[in-house]
């Protein structure tokens, strides 16, 4: 996070010293790819820096010259949240000055150019927040994987081909009761780790292992320094609060 902030500030410094208007705009364009919690948080934070914090710091450009884009291939940002909260998050971002682009797929990233199915954006500041590929170790297991390279696992977190090999966290595709894979977030990995560790220590055979059950305590996405949306258990809420983001 600190490296990203440093690179953002360096981009403004480059823009200040650049005489060519087109090149300067390249430094002032910021593109975040991926409308999940990480992408939303980054876009909001960048917008606050670009449109509020540096307004009086430079002479050769002003805050109106900066452009912050958030690109999401799906129909809405934050798809893990309800449509209502997703819409609120979009409104919050747009009020901060972020240009939110949904239903727009990134087809290629060239040097300083983001190519989508709807056009191009020239930028020296391109941040990928659209997810990660699973660990290359999964390929060596020679087991069933999904489209993202994650191991498709049983209800006891073991792989399909060997009940003594376990895969957890964002390297695994564990389907919940609705048939949807659990998100690749820390709480899932922590709970799976405790579950698997307990079975290993107790040397529980597969036919006696209780299925893993994830206890969802809620998720939250921050939007800039003073806005957030969250889901706590089955209750939905939107918050206005101070944060350290």
Where are these regions (language model features)?
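Internal hydrophobic alpha-helix adjacent to the cofactor/substrate pocket in enzyme cavities
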Residues: 188-214
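FAD-site-proximal beta/loop scaffold in flavoenzymes
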Residues: 1-20, 112-113, 120-191, 198
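Glycine-rich dinucleotide-binding loop and its adjacent helix/turn
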Residues: 1-38, 47-52
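Conserved small/polar residues in nucleotide/adenosyl-binding loops
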Residues: 237-243
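A Rossmann-like FAD-binding core segment of flavoenzymes
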Residues: 47-155, 161
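Glycine-rich loop/hinge motif
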Residues: 43
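Residues at the starts of beta-strands that form the adenosine-phosphate
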Residues: 29, 67, 164
């Amino acid at each position: 996070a600190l490296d990203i902030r440093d690179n953002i500030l360096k981009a403004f410094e480059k823009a200040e010293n650049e005489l060519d208007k087109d090149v300067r705009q390249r430094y002032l364009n910021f593109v975040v790819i991926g409308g999940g919690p990480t992408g939303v948080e980054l876009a909001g934070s960048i917008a606050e820096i670009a449109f509020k914090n540096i307004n009086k710091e430079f002479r050769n450009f002003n805050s109106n010259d900066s452009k912050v884009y958030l690109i999401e291939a799906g129909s809405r940002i934050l798809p893990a949240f309800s449509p209502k909260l997703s819409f609120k998050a979009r409104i919050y971002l747009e009020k901060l000055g972020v240009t939110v682009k949904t239903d727009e797929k990134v087809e290629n990233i060239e040097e300083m150019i983001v190519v989508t199915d709807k056009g191009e954006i020239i930028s020296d500041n391109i941040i990928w927040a659209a997810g990660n590929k699973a660990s290359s170790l999964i390929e060596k297991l020679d087991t069933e994987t999904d489209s993202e390279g994650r191991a498709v696992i049983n209800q006891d977190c073991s792989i399909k081909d060997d009940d003594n090999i376990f895969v957890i966290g964002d390297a695994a595709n564990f389907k919940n009761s609705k048939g949807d894979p659990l998100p690749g977030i820390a709480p899932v990995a922590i709970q799976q780790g405790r579950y698997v560790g307990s079975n290993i220590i107790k040397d529980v055979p597969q036919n006696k292992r209780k299925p893993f059950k994830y206890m969802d305590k809620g998720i939250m996405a921050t939007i800039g320094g003073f806005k957030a949306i969250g889901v706590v258990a089955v209750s939905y809420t939107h918050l206005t609060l101070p944060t350290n983001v």
